[in-house]
């Protein structure tokens, strides 16, 4: 597998991005890493690069404050655009970027393109509960149709089998305001009908926000606006809970003694919810394995993201296309 890495994308680029890519290259000797970036910024960091790392020159990064489409039109040599074109040409099989999320999505749609039968892509992220749950969409498609949510469920099911290594068919839930089939707005009710009728989906029914980590569903689908709000809320609540625990334990001598005794378990909890364990979120629905990293990704997060691509990305697009085609055949639909 060959992975194009946007070496200039992210708050800690290029140092942390390159360091993580080099660590992944050593960990995965059968994977070729194509670092994409300005030679003057990247080459000095490659003195000890293993043989499966190479540099592909590009212009600068798309900044976080830039409008993605306008930036790509005005600067087609931007690092994320060059990386996406490597996937389109077949020189790379996958793309990783920790830069501007909108730019990564736009470059993927513009240069790589959507897979057959998929009108809109979805960003899928793993919620690190005691029962890890795949949530999609978390930001690629803010406004959805019911058919899009069905497609997300199919994409997520295929991906969860590979990435989460679920036993049997992953159970899919529809994020809603209640468990009953008639709950929610028109979109939710129509999506519920389509999901319940699909032979490609093991539908578990509606799932409320409080049940995301309960194990009722392995995959939960929603529109990108709601999914992004859920993700950011979960991240904020996790940080606040850790802060409150730390404050309570360190506020007294007895608490500090207890904290010292519990330190290994507290660190294990902190590490469990650390997004660096996964390193990024897959953009499903495009003709390549695309992973969007966190803007503040460190070398550890980049390494884990590239390892995730190597584990789940091989043959992913072909399987997604085949599964969507079976759904279209079963429903009598032609491509969206």
UniProtKB/Swiss-Prot annotation:
**GO MF terms, alphabetically ordered:** phosphate:acyl-[acyl carrier protein] acyltransferase activity
Question: Record keywords: Ion transport included?
Answer: no
Please state the Enzyme Commission number of this protein.
2.3.1.274
Q: Which residues cross the membrane?
A: none
Q: Which reaction does it catalyse?
A: a fatty acyl-[ACP] + phosphate = an acyl phosphate + holo-[ACP]
UniProt cross-references to HAMAP family, sorted A to Z: PlsX
Q: What is the documented function of this protein?
A: Catalyzes the reversible formation of acyl-phosphate (acyl-PO(4)) from acyl-[acyl-carrier-protein] (acyl-ACP). This enzyme utilizes acyl-ACP as fatty acyl donor, but not acyl-CoA.
- What family is it from? Belongs to the PlsX family.
Q: Name one GO cellular component term.
A: cytoplasm
**Binding partners and assembly:** Homodimer. Probably interacts with PlsY.
Main location class = cytoplasm
**NCBIfam families recorded for this chain?**
plsX (TIGR00182)
Q: What Pfam families does UniProt report for this protein, alphabetically?
A: FA_synthesis (PF02504)
Alphabetically sorted, this entry's keywords are: Cytoplasm, Lipid biosynthesis, Lipid metabolism, Phospholipid biosynthesis, Phospholipid metabolism, Transferase
Localized where? Cytoplasm
Entries under InterPro entries matching the protein: FA_synthesis, Phospholipid_synth_PlsX-like
Q: Which domain of life is it from?
A: Bacteria
The pathway to which it is assigned is: Lipid metabolism; phospholipid metabolism
- Put simply, this protein is called Phosphate acyltransferase
Q: Name one GO biological process term.
A: fatty acid biosynthetic process
């Amino acid at each position: 597998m060959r992975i194009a890495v946007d070496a200039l994308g992210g708050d800690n680029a290029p140092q942390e991005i390159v360091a993580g890519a080099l660590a992944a290259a050593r960990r995965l000797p059968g994977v070729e890493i194509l670092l994409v970036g300005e030679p003057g910024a990247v080459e000095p960091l490659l003195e000890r690069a293993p043989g499966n790392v190479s540099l592909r020159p590009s212009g600068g990064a798309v900044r976080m404050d830039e409008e993605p489409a306008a930036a790509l039109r005005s600067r087609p040599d931007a690092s994320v655009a060059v990386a996406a074109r490597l996937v389109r040409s077949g020189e790379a099989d996958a793309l990783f970027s920790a830069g501007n999320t909108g730019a990564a999505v736009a470059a993927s749609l513009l240069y790589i393109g959507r897979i057959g039968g998929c009108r809109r892509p979805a960003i899928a992220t793993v919620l690190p509960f005691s029962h890890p749950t795949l949530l999609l969409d978390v930001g690629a498609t803010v406004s959805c149709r019911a058919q899009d949510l069905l497609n997300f469920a199919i994409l997520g099911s295929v991906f969860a089998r590979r990435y989460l290594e679920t036993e049997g068919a992953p159970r899919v839930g529809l994020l809603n305001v209640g468990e009953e089939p008639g709950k929610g707005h028109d979109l939710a009710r129509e999506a519920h009908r389509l999901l319940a009728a699909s032979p490609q989906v093991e539908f578990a029914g509606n799932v409320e926000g409080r049940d995301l980590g309960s194990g009722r569903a392995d995959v939960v689908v929603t529109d990108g606006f709601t999914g992004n709000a859920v993700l950011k809320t979960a991240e904020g609540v996790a940080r606040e809970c850790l802060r409150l625990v730390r404050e309570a334990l360190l506020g007294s001598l007895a608490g500090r003694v207890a904290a010292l005794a519990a330190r290994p378990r507290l660190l294990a909890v902190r590490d469990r919810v650390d997004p660096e364990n996964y390193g990024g979120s897959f953009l499903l629905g495009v003709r390549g394995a695309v992973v969007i990293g966190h803007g503040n990704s460190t070398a550890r997060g980049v390494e884990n993201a590239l390892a995730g691509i190597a584990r789940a990305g091989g043959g992913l697009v072909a399987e997604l296309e085949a599964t969507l085609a079976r759904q279209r055949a079963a429903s009598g639909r032609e491509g969206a």
